Structure formats: structure tokens, C-alpha cells
Amino acid sequence: MEKKSVLILGTASHVGKSSVVTAICRILSREYRVAPFKAQNMSLNSWITKDGKEIGIAQAIQAKAAGTEPTADMNPVLLKPKGDCVSQIILLGEPYADRSAGKYYESIAEMNEVLEGALKRLCNEHDIIVMEGAGGAAEINLYERDIVNIGTARLTQAPIILVGDIERGGVFASLYGTVALLPEDVRKNVKGFIINKFRGDLEILKPGLKQLEEKTGIPVLGVLPYFKLNIPSEDSVSLEDKEAEKNEKEIEIAVIRLPRISNFTDFEPLERSAKIRYVELDEDLGTPDAIMIPGTKNTVNDLLDLKASGMAEKIQAFKGKIPIFGICGGYQMLGKTIYDSGVENGVEAEFEGLGLLDIGTKFGEYKKRTIQVTKKVSAYGPILAPIDGEEIKGYEIHMGITDSCRNIFGNDGAIDKAGLVIGTYLHGLFDNKNIRDALMQYLYEKKGLEYIPENSMTESDAYEELANVVEQNLDMEKFYEIIGI
């Protein structure tokens, strides 16, 4: 590839590739026109571009860090797991097909053509392309059909930087082993290592760094400290980490961890003021201060699982007592009925919802609504009435049409008579400070606590914070030399 570029690969999933790319995009954007690129992403969390295309949320974040508008070319192939070894394929931001892994691999040649076109368009509009691999780079069973690691490396011939995670142990073996297993034509382009999530005394680590460099002939560009990010998470591994985190806040919000959960980043903004507890269907719901039902890749099947587990009855028992929010698929579940023509579950049928909202949803065709929106709050009740008439922003990613006689955000959403059960199709709802503060004000006052609205860190501040950490701990002179600037 003639354009300046760099490919960030990893030894495994969740080693920090996306964060490193975000930081690099921010750093380079100070002097160059930069674009992120990930040929193929598998993610439960997605983002809608201004022109209504769906991409992985990580690439949207990276683009914004680079100061450029997110586009479908930055993530030409998005795989959204639906369960039962089937994923929905999003091609250049549009729904393409639902396929098993085996069937998907049969169309790799077609996918390659798509990503090559996307990459060419990005190169025409930007000075530097910062590319990201997926999972572990050394998946030797997938080399011949891997488009995101080996495929991208071979297509672009870009210099490669390999990221390893020291937090989970075995980082030296992971880095050395990954390099050893890479095909020779790819291995020769590995120009540096980054060790991520380090806690402790760097002096103790240095002998290992030296031996790694001697054994591989590849320099360690830097050791990045463990750092709590203030940007949205990408995948379900992040969700596991959240569940392990300690949170001593006095307000507890239970998020139902649906088997096919999607866009759980919707609730991350609430972590600043409340303890967010992800509850499995077979777990005790406890006595939360509020309940959230998130989006899902299959509303019907998750609704059936919710009922079979007994969790549906537990949620229904809280009606009128605490706030219950449903977003996207969770909103659909809150209604009285869901009619499926076969789009969701393969057969035509009508299902009874939770009955907490006076709405009904119909899945009539394989068609997804993807759009960024600005809405005006028009609602009553103890939570939303204080912000009646104010604007909020969000984005929609859903199939199905819902009929509601009590819209609360323009022509979207619904609310019960008490104003405590609230449903909406808007992802990013709690990114709106007025919505977030309205909910927290209600929850804090109900417990006799004083709510002090947080001073929200802006997106730009978060990107700068991350970029500064990376810049301070990376050999930037060597990095610039590697990418040729």
C-alpha cells in the first residue's frame, strides 16, 4: 500500500488493540489526516454513521479520536452474533445475510473485494491509515481465510506492531509464540512490540524485555500502564471485566444480561453515579433501585428465555415500585405482544410480552432501521417531567415496528401511567446528560441522598487522556520511524 500505514495486531482478544489504535489515531491527527480501518469486526456493540450505516463502535470511537467522521469504509465487514453459531453480516454498513461460520467462509473472496474497495477509498481521502487486527494474530487454523489479520497484512504490506497483555500473565510467551507462528511473509513486517496493562515496577520487567528483543530481533516500543478507560467498551470480554470490578456506590442498577445481549455500552455512562450489576437469568435479581433491559440480537428468543428462567416474573413484580427501562429489544419485550412473521424466529407466531407497556411490536420483514436522531422529550412522571421539552440525541438499530399511544421522545418510545416504566429504541440514551441526571436525581432523592451531577469528561478529553498515556510510555521516535514519517 502506497499510503503511510501501520497495522496493530494482538496476541489474543482484549489485549488492548482498539485502545492503542484510538490513541495512535489521536496522536497522529495533530499533524495528519488519519483514518482507522478494521477489515472485519465481530462485536455486540455497534454505531450508526451520519448516513445511516452500521459499524463497530470501536471504529467509530477511533474515527472521532482522529477528528474525522466515521464511515462504513472503516469497518466494511461487521459480524453481529445472534446465537446458535449464526451471525448477522453487515456489509458496508448494510444488513447482508445471517450465516453460520462455515457459510460465511465460503464468501471470503467476495468479502476481500469489499474491503479492498473500502481501503482504497480511505487512502484517497487520508494521509495515514491506522489498521487493527482481530483476536489473536496467530490463529493458524484460519490463515487461508483470515481477512482481518493475515489477509490485511498481506494486502497492505504495512509495518506491524504486536500488542500483548501482561495483566493475565504469559506475555513473553504470547509475543514470542505469536511471532514464531506467523507466516514468514507476515513475520518479516513485525517491527515492534507493545506490552499493555502493566502494574508494578518496570525495573523488574526490563530483563525480560531485553531477552525478548534478543530472541526475536524485534524492539519493545513501550510498556503501557494499566489505565481505566473513559471510552465505551467493544465486546463481551469487557462485560466480564465489569462484573469483576468493585463498586461501592449507594445506588444499584440491575442490567438483565440477556443471552444475546447487544449494545451494553448504553449503560456505561451510568457507572459514574451508580453501581451497575449485570444479572444472569438464573441469578437472584435482588432489590435494585432500577432495572434495565438491554438490546438483543434476537428479541423473541431472549423473551422466551426470560420467561422460562422466571426472570420475567421477577421484573414484573417491580412494576410501580422502581424505574424499569427497556432499550431497543428490551423496549419490545416490555410490550403486550410481539408478532413475528418469521424474521426473528424462523416461523410465524405471536408472543406475549411482559405487559408492562401498552405497546405491540411487529416483525414483518428482514429490514433494519439504522439512523442517528435528535428528539424532544415529551413525557410526564417523576423521572422525565423535569426535562419535558428538552432535546436528546441517540441512534436506532432495530428491526420491527412498535405501535405506542404514549410516545415520549418525538415519535419514539412509550411510558406507563405511573411514569416509571420507560421504553425507547434510542441507543446512547444515557449519553445525554439531561436524561442521566433526571434518572439519578430521582433515584438519589428516593433514598434520601443528595445527588451532585458529575462534571462529565468530554469525548475529546477522554481521547487526549488516552493519547497522553500512550505517548508518554511509547518510544515515539522509533514509532514514527517505523511508519515512515
From Swiss-Prot:
* SUPFAM superfamilies cross-referenced by the UniProt entry: Class I glutamine amidotransferase-like, P-loop containing nucleoside triphosphate hydrolases
Record-level GO BP terms: cobalamin biosynthetic process
Where in the sequence is the active site?
Answer: 328 (nucleophile), 427
The protein's UniProt keywords, in alphabetical order, are: Cobalamin biosynthesis, Glutamine amidotransferase
Q: Enumerate the InterPro entries for this protein.
A: Class_I_gatase-like (IPR029062), CobQ/CobB/MinD/ParA_Nub-bd_dom (IPR002586), CobQ_GATase1 (IPR033949), CobQ_N (IPR047045), CobQ_synth (IPR004459), GATase_3 (IPR011698), P-loop_NTPase (IPR027417)
Function summary = Catalyzes amidations at positions B, D, E, and G on adenosylcobyrinic A,C-diamide. NH(2) groups are provided by glutamine, and one molecule of ATP is hydrogenolyzed for each amidation.
Q: Which family does it belong to?
A: Belongs to the CobB/CobQ family. CobQ subfamily.
Q: What is this protein called?
A: Probable cobyric acid synthase
